[in-house]
């Protein structure tokens, strides 16, 4: 719009765009070769994906120790109504060993919030039945009811400033705060003892330099350099863009595309990358996203469980009697 306004008013103004969004929604749809049109991925996404993956690894260690009282941990993440950020949780556990549910805005109904809550509860209880604990990563744009969302001057939802949050609404439902007994005690919907608790990383997702992806940092610099070269050449009305080589090993090139093309492009998380059970993503997403987070993730020690013969009488905690 600025570029067109400058032209109409005969202003000597060069307008060049540079992609930048952790949501990864600037660009076109998935192509047949496995890359995205317009701009394969946006600077910022690789780092927020790495941040979330490390958070999941750490949360899993804590959940393994606390599940007897807090069997369910719900982590709400940014991304508005686009699912690329919550999908990155799978990068922490590509072998699917963690009792992890990934809930994307594109996975569930846009209108039936009650059905969404019931569906998530069913999937949580399936995990609890098998593994006695569960970690849920949910995008802030998933419909779980009225959150009292504020909107900016353009009408865009400001999820971080809403009266309620998606993760809080979900744990309220799981814990049964909407159906208290005559003594004021919530009637949990979980099939095990304990509660669901929530966590919202907030702006740490996009600001923590200690979790930055070196690949992301390098590409952010280079796409900025390319934009500068476009401007210095005298060209106008373009955005610098990242073009991914569909072949291995991972490699990108930098190019330009008309701002009008970018403005008319739209990207959502591909339906073909959502698992059949709607609570996970496919290996195709993992293969696409893994190079973006850079160096290998931290590894946690796994102790071998060696049991000795039982000698003491069985002890049952007071709460379980």
Task: Tell me the role of every PLM-derived stretch.
Residues 19-24, 80-81, 107-109, 202-205, ...:
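Acidic, glycine-rich active-site loops and adjacent beta-strand->loop/helix elements
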Residues 21, 25, 77, 101-102, ...:
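Residue-level preference for alpha-helix termini and adjacent loops
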Residues 1-16, 27, 33-194:
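Accessory alpha-helical/coil subdomains and C-terminal extensions
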Residues 31, 91, 95, 236-239, ...:
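Generic secondary-structure boundary signal with a strong preference for alpha-helix termini
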Residues 146-321:
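C-terminal non-catalytic interaction/assembly regions of soluble proteins
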